[in-house]
A protein has these predicted regions:
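Non-catalytic, mostly N-terminal accessory regions of nucleic-acid modification and defense proteins
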Residues: 1-183, 187-188, 253-264
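Conserved S-adenosyl-L-methionine
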Residues: 166-272
């Protein structure tokens, strides 16, 4: 049963990470999980784009794509130990942080660089790192039921942030955001913006209400374009992007930027939301 396997997911990772001297406390554990989950979820998206787009090209160099370094096909070829640690610290991270991104880069490609800009690998033990990667790679995100169920697990990971102290400020309880979305009753075609969106709670509650209204390809396109967010802190930004990819948004229009810095005079008609 999908759910019972998944409910043990967070605990299995926590138990492995507990043995790694580099992980200090819950916030770091969640941050460590976050970049791996992002790459796993992004890889599932890329498999989709590969199938559905002509000549899809990944922004990630081949050796750094999750499917090429993280997946362990049990042939004995998968990196582990010091070799894995060296690859993650000295190839993967520097490469993703320096991906060439400019104003013309499509959002769905640019998010890899913006997500990794301040990410860290805290783990110091390559064997434990391999174990965690294998647990994460067991997720079958191509399976609708499983990826849907994983959305709930992801929610529980975000909820843990509340008790992890420092990062709790980014998390608004789901009961609150769901209630607000139901009161607003958004309709397909309406847009919303959250200018301090944290891990994406309001946005995903809004999408939950809209998803039930999607009847056609045109609706699906409007659904995908119905939200906009800004988060100035790196860690919740990464969590938010992953959250939106899990909610079926191929182009998460959430930007890592400080809304408060943008002078009110800079806003144009186009920048207005419902």
């Amino acid at each position: 049963n999908t759910m019972s396997n998944l409910s043990g997911f967070v605990k299995r990772i926590r138990d492995i990470m507990r043995n790694d001297a580099g992980i200090n406390g819950d916030a770091q554990r969640i941050e460590q999980m976050a970049w791996m989950l992002f790459l796993k979820v992004y890889d599932a998206k890329e498999q989709d784009w590969d199938m559905n787009e002509d000549n899809y090209e990944s922004i990630i160099p081949e050796e750094c794509r999750w499917c090429n370094w993280a997946v362990d096909d049990r042939s004995g070829k998968a990196m582990t130990g010091d070799k894995l640690l060296d690859f993650v610290n000295n190839t993967l991270f520097p490469t993703l942080k320096k991906l060439p991104v400019d104003a013309s880069t499509p959002i769905k490609k640019a998010i890899v660089q913006t997500t990794f800009a301040d990410a860290n690998n805290y783990m110091k033990d390559g064997v434990l790192l391999r174990q965690v990667i294998n647990v994460i790679d067991e997720l079958d995100l191509s399976d609708y039921e499983e990826s849907h169920a994983f959305g709930d697990i992801y929610e529980s990971i975000l909820k843990e942030l509340q008790s992890a102290g420092s990062a709790g400020e980014f998390y608004t309880p789901r009961a609150v955001t769901d209630f607000m979305a139901q009161m607003i009753q958004p309709k397909i075609g309406e847009t919303m913006a959250d200018f301090a969106c944290g891990t994406g709670g309001f946005i995903t509650s809004w999408l939950k209400v809209l998803q039930k209204q999607v009847q056609s390809t045109a609706d699906a396109k409007k659904y995908g374009e119905s939200v906009y967010g800004i988060e100035k802190k790196q860690f919740p930004y990464m969590l938010c992007i992953t959250n939106l990819l899990l909610h079926g948004l191929d182009i998460p229009r959430v930007f890592h930027d400080n809304t408060l810095l943008k002078d009110v005079l800079d806003y144009t008609e186009d920048d207005q939301f419902d």
